[in-house]
Amino acid sequence: MDITGYTKWQYKTINASILKSIGHQELIYYVEILSPWPVSNRDLVVHLRIEQNSITEITQFHCRGIPDYIPAKEGVSRVPMSRSTWHVEPIANNKLKIEYTMEIDPSGSVPAWLMNKLSAEGPYESFFALKNSILSRNYSKADAPF
């Protein structure tokens, strides 16, 4: 997992780092997300678990927030609850079907107009940037440890 690469494609992510590796298919990481005024930046600590079916090669990334893992950063709102899943399925040579679901409590007061904007814009911008990042950084030859 290229967690530090999140800043290149994950929408509004300004900091990403691995806090702990727990084998080849599990880790804990930290991300900070830039938020527009008047909202303070948000951060998350995430426990990531990866599963892959050896026959179908379908890979699932299960992410769960663990907000108390490290102390909160001053001036940044810690996300108290987050869950997400990436379902990645090979469908043809060099083609993937990716389904992403996320449930999040952003913490604090976030105007509805801003949540609506980010909910619509974030996934689109992230997937667009992810595709470009994969193509430009040539991840097709990457060796996955699972």
Spans of model-derived segments:
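Eukaryotic helix-grip
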Residues: 1-146
